[in-house]
């Protein structure tokens, strides 16, 4: 029985024949004027974000495939943009390259199963600045001919390898940028450990991109020390809110708590934090009345707001969640039974964050099954907002996703990032005074979160 790759290549011959019938190439094709490789080297870790409507493994991924909206979002986060050109299996086109190129300043990668010089010339004519060449598809002679053609058009070449044999082969040939594909193209299964296994076989100074199977910020942080960047498509394309998906993938799910002003909430959203915290505990210096909180949630609708509650009644929490359309509740001092009751009372769109106050390893009790997430905070005189941290090394063996809070600031952020939390929860460390955030500190923090 033919593999998926064999079927694709069989159909690709017919598709290339159709492309030649439907597109006339000019005698002289303008060379690429955007440096794909240079763009990948501008940050310590780069991202090639992909426009992908469908795939053989997942079928239709993004029904609302609005290229202009996708391009506009990627412009904020991508080092380069990849565009699928395969029509039958990915529902892409070479015309899509032109659309993205015309509406973006980023270098564009033509992603196709390239077997013919015509595809490279057409890709360049449409505005592509780089092409993907796959050693699983090409023999040495064809690979070198296509590689040299692309370079003659001033295009970068992303050469894809997927096993040791292909790497040994590549090292005898020419290469520009190397992509390690975590997907088996014959079975379509993915394994990100593939990158870790194959990276040591490649030269230390090679520019390496990890491709396929990248779904989370945790995976990014685990692989980032070994590669120069990532090519990500499916995990972003399947999400309705593409901007939020990009932020979660690249920066993690971070939060600024204790918001009391609209201007601070706007600064938090503008600097790509996912969550804004509103404290409804009256003893807190950052307490906010529900009617004042409503003004903030209405003014910054795209920020996901989390309500912080300390031993309040289920009825009160339910009322505030509904009124403010909170995306999560952060609970201090609630029993397993109370959390279970609250889960039944709240809409399914509202997550439950169970706070576990910690000072030593003996405080690391398991998450209540009804809670969506654990948030570890420092045990202190107050329920949160103590401004001190605990020994984060005790979290080393925690395997379930968690948020980290307690005394986080610009001085200890680098250490906190090594804890590998799902997200970090900042409060007093970003303030001028209780409840009044420092916009410059928020900006500086956002920059640090991207410095990996």
Curated annotation (Swiss-Prot):
GO terms for molecular function: indole-3-glycerol-phosphate synthase activity; phosphoribosylanthranilate isomerase activity. Residues 254-448 are annotated as: N-(5'-phosphoribosyl)anthranilate isomerase. Keywords: Amino-acid biosynthesis, Aromatic amino acid biosynthesis, Decarboxylase, Isomerase, Lyase, Multifunctional enzyme, Tryptophan biosynthesis. This is Tryptophan biosynthesis protein TrpCF. Gene3D superfamilies: Aldolase class I. Residues 1-253 are annotated as: Indole-3-glycerol phosphate synthase. Bifunctional enzyme that catalyzes two sequential steps of tryptophan biosynthetic pathway. The first reaction is catalyzed by the isomerase, coded by the TrpF domain; the second reaction is catalyzed by the synthase, coded by the TrpC domain. Pathway: Amino-acid biosynthesis; L-tryptophan biosynthesis; L-tryptophan from chorismate: step 3/5; Amino-acid biosynthesis; L-tryptophan biosynthesis; L-tryptophan from chorismate: step 4/5. In the N-terminal section; belongs to the TrpC family.
């Amino acid at each position: 029985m033919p593999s998926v790759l064999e079927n694709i290549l069989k159909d690709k011959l017919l598709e290339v024949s159709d492309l030649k019938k439907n597109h006339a190439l000019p005698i002289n094709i303008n060379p690429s004027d955007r440096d794909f490789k240079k763009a990948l080297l501008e940050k310590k870790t780069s991202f090639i974000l992909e426009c992908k409507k469908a795939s053989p493994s997942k079928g239709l991924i993004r029904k609302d495939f609005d290229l202009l909206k996708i391009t506009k979002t990627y412009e904020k986060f991508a080092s380069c943009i990849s565009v699928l050109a395969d029509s039958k299996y990915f529902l892409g086109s070479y015309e899509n390259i032109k659309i993205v190129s015309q509406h973006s300043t980023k270098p564009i990668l033509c992603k196709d199963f390239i077997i013919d010089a015509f595809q490279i010339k057409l890709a360049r004519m449409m505005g592509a600045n780089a092409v993907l060449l796959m050693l699983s598809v090409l023999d040495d002679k064809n690979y070198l001919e296509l590689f040299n053609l692309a370079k003659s058009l001033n295009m970068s070449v992303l050469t894809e390898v997927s096993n040791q044999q292909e790497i040994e082969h590549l090292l005898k040939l020419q290469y520009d940028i190397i992509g390690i594909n975590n997907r088996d193209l014959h079975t379509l299964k993915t394994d990100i450990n593939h990158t870790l296994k194959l990276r040591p076989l490649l030269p230390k100074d090679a520019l390496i991109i990890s491709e396929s199977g990248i779904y989370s910020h945790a995976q990014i942080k685990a692989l980032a020390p070994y590669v120069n960047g990532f090519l990500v498509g499916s995990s972003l394309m399947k999400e309705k809110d593409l901007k939020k998906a990009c932020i979660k993938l690249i920066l993690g799910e971070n939060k600024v708590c204790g918001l009391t002003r609209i201007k601070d909430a706007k600064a938090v959203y503008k600097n790509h934090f996912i969550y804004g915290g509103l404290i409804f505990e009256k003893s807190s210096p950052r307490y906010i009345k529900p009617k004042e909180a409503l003004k903030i949630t209405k003014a910054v609708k795209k920020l996901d707001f989390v309500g912080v509650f300390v031993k309040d009644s289920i009825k009160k929490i339910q009322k505030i969640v509904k009124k403010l359309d909170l995306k999560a509740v952060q609970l201090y001092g609630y029993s397993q039974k109370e959390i279970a009751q609250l889960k039944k009372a709240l809409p399914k769109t509202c997550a439950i964050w169970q706070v576990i106050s910690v000072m030593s390893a003996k405080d690391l009790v398991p998450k209540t099954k009804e809670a969506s997430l654990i948030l570890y905070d420092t045990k202190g005189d107050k329920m949160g907002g103590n401004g001190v941290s605990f020994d984060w090394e005790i979290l080393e063996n925690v395997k379930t996703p968690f948020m980290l809070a307690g005394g986080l600031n610009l001085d200890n952020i680098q250490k906190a990032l090594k804890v590998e939390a799902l997200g970090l929860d900042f409060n007093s460390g970003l303030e001028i005074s209780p409840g009044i955030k420092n916009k410059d500190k928020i900006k500086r923090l956002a920059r640090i979160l991207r410095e990996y």
